[in-house]
């Protein structure tokens, strides 16, 4: 890893605002949290709804983290598509987002490096995200004495996904 750029979950609303909202199809029942977010409807999320959509787990659908992660993937895919579209319309658009989040992000990269990286990303193709297979169980791994739903990834699945991503073969590097 040559650098990192992080944005806390609490800043999703601000990111959403900077891009003018992100369109998603509501995947879970949000009726206990926000009755305007109706299951199956396609909406452009308000800033507060964007945070709710990617953050909330309890009182939403089956309350499973896997469901929340699916919503996060959908949000990221739609965000990527929107940013890519807006960047094609206005080449400096990505810099507007960067400047808007500068005080909220944590990074070890300089502006020039981020600019090069975002330029490459904006011209790229969204290849999706991997969900690793595993088992859902209930446990007390957080140490708070409360049963929580936990997800444990199969070791073989970890190897399989890393092999797919990096083109690894036993005993060989990708370019050998």
Predicted regions: what they are:
Residues 2-3, 49-51, 124, 149:
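Intrinsically disordered, low-complexity segments enriched in small/polar residues
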Residues 45, 106-176:
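C-terminal solvent-exposed extensions
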Residues 1-3, 38-40, 58-67, 80-88, ...:
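Second-shell loop/turn segments in exported
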Residues 2-6, 52-53, 128-131:
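Structural recognition of the beta-strand scaffold that forms the well-ordered cores
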Residues 11-94, 173:
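Flexible, polar/acidic helix-loop-strand segments at domain edges
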Residues 1-2, 7-22, 27, 57, ...:
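Structured segments of extracytoplasmic/periplasmic soluble domains
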């Amino acid at each position: 890893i040559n650098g990192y750029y992080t944005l806390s979950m609490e800043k999703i609303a601000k990111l959403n605002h900077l891009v003018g909202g992100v369109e998603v199809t509501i995947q879970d029942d949000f009726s206990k949290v926000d009755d305007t977010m109706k299951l199956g409807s396609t909406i452009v999320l308000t800033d507060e709804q964007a945070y709710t959509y990617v953050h909330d787990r309890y009182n939403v659908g089956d309350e499973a983290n896997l469901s929340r992660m699916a919503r996060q993937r959908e949000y990221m895919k739609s965000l990527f598509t929107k940013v890519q579209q807006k960047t094609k319309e206005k080449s400096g658009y990505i810099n507007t987002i960067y400047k808007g989040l500068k005080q909220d992000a944590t990074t070890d990269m300089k502006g020039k490096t981020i600019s090069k990286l975002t330029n490459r990303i904006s011209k790229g193709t969204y290849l999706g995200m991997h969900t690793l297979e595993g088992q859902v169980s209930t446990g007390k791994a957080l140490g708070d004495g409360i049963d929580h739903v936990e997800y444990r990834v199969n070791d073989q699945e970890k190897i399989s996904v890393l092999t797919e991503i990096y083109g690894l073969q036993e005993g060989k590097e990708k370019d050998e």
